[in-house]
């Protein structure tokens, strides 16, 4: 009986993994279907010109969909942005915060709000893309074959439907597959660009444009970078939590001590993504609109990759968003109240405000270290990419996302296997009884 259960749970895990892989293949297939009315030759020259801007970063996150202007050009970014906005609003807007506390029903309503906001954001972004494409004229001609109202409408509908389809596919992976669907879609997009980035680097080395020693150093650096990211992402501060003893009849229960883990990098990959988006927007706007404005020219120059102003602002924004997002993810006051509700306490700290202040003190120190770690991981590859023409797919932000998704998926697989074994053990105990 135990063997049959183990075999059944193993087959279930395999079916989940196969389902996830099939959905990701569909996502990759869709990234090669272009939107109607685009001159692919003219578009490719524009994509090459904007490889280092925010366009390049979003193109990397979308697995090249934006550069090819496919139906998945907006990727799943509008959904992520909408989810973050709803999360921010739930902190500032009391009715939304109360809605989140209503259990499964409240969660479904919040998710529905995220979907509505996704449609709105995707519509605005799609219209902006359509207008921008119509304004671009290259040496080979305009990017849009037949500009006008019909092109704008079809582009908006196509891109919004593409984003919503990706969102739905991501939800299917989360529910019926393994891992977080949204993260895995971004993950597969980044991974798809790594082989071409490596081939391009060795091609430059073969032609003499890049030293073979530098190419080898980059490969070794990537391995070291991954090891550093794994170390810091797994690092955590464990706080001792004590539960009081309870007497029921003649027996005494409880009194055990557990640990509350606080991650060193609580904010994850959000700070670098937000910081890059803000800093690279002016340069990308100038490239997209073919603007010759002196102000735009200065912004493009000073906010270019590797420039001192860019690096300083980049680090400052990463630190800011590290603190900002950590405050959203971990609510010290709410956690302290929950501990008090269950009778738990931190040894040496009074329940309530004293415990909340202690959490803030620990989190502040952890966030400073986490922010410095994110800054170093993102800035050093940034400087190298600026000097040695290396693809964004080999940058710090991309590896942060990839490593985080792999670690999260592996944890889910381990949890699934452990829970399956536990259920099998409980069934054996019931049969014996």
UniProtKB/Swiss-Prot annotation:
The reply on keyword Acetylation is no
Kindly give the membrane topology term recorded for this protein: Multi-pass membrane protein
Which keywords annotate this record?
Cell inner membrane, Cell membrane, Membrane, Protein transport, Translocation, Transmembrane, Transmembrane helix, Transport
Matching InterPro entries? SecY (IPR026593), SecY/SEC61-alpha (IPR002208), SecY_CS (IPR030659), SecY_dom_sf (IPR023201)
Where it mainly occurs, coarsely classed, is: membrane
Q: Pfam families, from UniProt?
A: SecY
- Keyword Transmembrane on this protein? yes
Record GO biological process: intracellular protein transmembrane transport; protein targeting; protein transport by the Sec complex
Sequence intervals crossing the membrane: 17-37, 71-91, 117-137, 141-161, 184-204, 212-232, 268-288, 310-330, 366-386, 388-408
Q: Where in the cell is it found?
A: Cell inner membrane
Task: Give any Gene Ontology cellular component.
Answer: plasma membrane
The record's subunit annotation is:
Component of the Sec protein translocase complex. Heterotrimer consisting of SecY, SecE and SecG subunits. The heterotrimers can form oligomers, although 1 heterotrimer is thought to be able to translocate proteins. Interacts with the ribosome. Interacts with SecDF, and other proteins may be involved. Interacts with SecA.
Q: What does this protein do?
A: The central subunit of the protein translocation channel SecYEG. Consists of two halves formed by TMs 1-5 and 6-10. These two domains form a lateral gate at the front which open onto the bilayer between TMs 2 and 7, and are clamped together by SecE at the back. The channel is closed by both a pore ring composed of hydrophobic SecY resides and a short helix (helix 2A) on the extracellular side of the membrane which forms a plug. The plug probably moves laterally to allow the channel to open. The ring and the pore may move independently.
Q: Which family does it belong to?
A: Belongs to the SecY/SEC61-alpha family.
Mind telling me which NCBIfam families this protein's record contains? 3a0501s007 (TIGR00967)
- This one is known as Protein translocase subunit SecY
Q: Origin organism of this chain? A: Rickettsia felis (strain ATCC VR-1525 / URRWXCal2) (Rickettsia azadi)
Q: What is the lineage of its organism?
A: Bacteria, Pseudomonadati, Pseudomonadota, Alphaproteobacteria, Rickettsiales
């Amino acid at each position: 009986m135990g063997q049959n259960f183990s075999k059944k749970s193993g087959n279930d895990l395999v079916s989940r993994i196969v389902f996830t892989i099939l959905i990701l293949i569909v996502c990759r297939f869709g990234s090669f279907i272009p939107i109607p009315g685009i001159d692919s030759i003219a578009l490719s020259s524009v994509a090459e010109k904007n490889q280092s801007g925010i366009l390049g970063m979003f193109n990397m996150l979308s697995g090249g969909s934006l550069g090819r202007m496919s139906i998945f050009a907006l990727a799943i970014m509008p959904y992520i942005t909408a989810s973050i906005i709803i999360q921010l609003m739930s902190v500032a807007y009391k009715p939304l915060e109360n809605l989140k506390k209503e259990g499964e029903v409240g969660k479904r309503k919040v998710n529905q709000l995220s979907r509505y906001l996704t449609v709105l954001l995707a519509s605005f972004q799609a219209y902006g893309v359509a207008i921008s494409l119509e304004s671009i004229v290259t040496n080979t001609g305009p990017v849009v074959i037949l500009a006008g109202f019909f092109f704008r409408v079809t582009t908006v509908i196509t891109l919004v439907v593409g984003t919503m389809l990706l969102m739905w596919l991501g939800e299917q992976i989360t529910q019926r597959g393994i891992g977080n669907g949204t993260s895995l879609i971004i993950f597969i997009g980044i991974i798809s660009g790594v082989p071409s980035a490596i081939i391009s680097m060795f091609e430059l080395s073969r032609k003499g444009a890049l030293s073979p020693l530098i190419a080898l150093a980059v490969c070794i650096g990537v391995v070291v970078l991954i090891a550093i990211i794994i170390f810091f992402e797994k690092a955590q501060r464990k706080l001792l939590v004590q539960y009081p003893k309870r007497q029921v009849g003649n027996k005494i229960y409880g009194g055990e001590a557990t640990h509350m883990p606080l991650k060193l990098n609580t904010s994850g990959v959000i700070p670098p993504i937000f910081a890059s988006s803000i800093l690279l927007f002016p340069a990308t706007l100038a490239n997209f609109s073919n603007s010759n404005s002196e102000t735009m020219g200065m912004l493009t120059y000073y906010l270019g990759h590797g420039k001192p102003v860019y690096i300083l602002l980049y680090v400052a924004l990463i630190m800011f968003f590290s603190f900002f997002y950590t405050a959203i993810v971990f609510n010290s006051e709410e956690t302290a109240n929950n501990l008090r509700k269950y009778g738990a306490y931190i040894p040496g700290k009074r329940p309530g405000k004293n415990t909340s202040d202690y959490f803030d003190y620990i989190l502040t120190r952890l966030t400073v270290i986490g922010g410095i770690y994110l800054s170093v991981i993102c800035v050093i590859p940034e400087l190298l990419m600026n000097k040695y023409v290396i693809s964004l797919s080999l940058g710090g932000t991309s590896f942060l996302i990839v490593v985080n998704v792999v670690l999260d998926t592996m944890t889910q697989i381990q949890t699934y296997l452990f829970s399956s074994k536990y259920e099998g053990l409980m069934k054996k105990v019931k049969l014996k009884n």
